[in-house]
Amino acid sequence: IIIAADTSMGKTSLAIKMAMNCGCPVAFYSMEMKKEQIAARMISIASGVSSNEILYSRLDSGKIQRIDKGVAKISGKPIYFDDRGTSNIETILSSIRMMKIKYGIKGVVVDYLQILNVNMKSSNKEQQMGDVARRLKNIAKELDIWVIALSQLSRDNQNPAPTLSRLRDTGQIA
């Protein structure tokens, strides 16, 4: 599954909500955010307190109570974060296999597709992204799991509406 949108449109938050609500073990690979930032987003989603307030301790007693309730809601959710920032697809695929064995994951979130590196001498980024998408699809089939990959849309001042042609560097996955 590819979730694509412009920058700062909520792709990561949507993926976090999906992982929190699926009721199954999920591996979450973030190339941009540390697990503390993702945890703050999870607590924010569960409590209604902004993640910036949580991260920077701008909290009054009412917000602290809401955070406590939010933490209680998400405690024990089987979400396993890999925030090493590795952008090597081989490393991620190996980690997915390990998490399937160790935790019994049923799903994977990859945030985000364009940051991943492929060990191939492809002439262009579009072919590399096609290879990444194919490999993620193959691992999903191999391990009987679902995979959600987040993707940026390229900017198009002529047509700001989201379209398949705006999937940045990913013409082969559309």
Language model features: what each stretch is:
Residues L113:
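Conserved Walker B
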Residues T7:
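The conserved Walker
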Residues S13, K17, N21-G104, V118:
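Cytosolic-facing regulatory segments adjacent to core modules
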Residues G10:
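Conserved glycine(s) of the Walker
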Residues N117-K125:
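Conserved ATPase-coupling elements of RecA-like P-loop NTPase cores
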Residues I1-I3, A27:
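Short hydrophobic/aromatic beta-strand immediately N-terminal to the Walker A/P-loop
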Residues Q127-A174:
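Phosphate-binding/switch region of NTP-binding enzymes
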